[in-house]
Amino acid sequence: MRIISTYAGHESSISVYDNGKITIIELDKLTGEKYFSLGKVSAVEQSEIIEQALETIDVDNDFDMWINGSYHQRRNGTLEEKKMENIINYKRTVYGPGHHLCHAHSAYWQSPFDKAYIISSDGGGNDGVFNIYRATRRSGPLADEQ
């Protein structure tokens, strides 16, 4: 099984799972640009950077799955996703969880609480800038309907 996961926002990265080995490539280290954002460069540059990243870890651009951690639930997301579909060779795709949902899971599962409300607020993500979740040990964090 070969899986590639991309995040194209600030501090972009690519993660590759290749038959039991996980490799993470921080693209700002590859490009030399602090806080590099793959989503803010042309499709040609995206292709070149992804090719360079995969060459660095000696992995072919041929994957069973692409985990798209960037473009769903965002304005103009469909266009950006189509660009990446033409760069990454994959058989199926799934969408990564929301930015704030990841914050909520990180906070809740490290807490001592059995039940909790979690507020996540920052500069933004693919799921907004301010989210509220409720959590139990059985369900984990779930979006609280307002």
Predicted feature residues:
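Short acidic/glycine-rich loops and adjacent helix/strand connectors
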Residues: 1-146
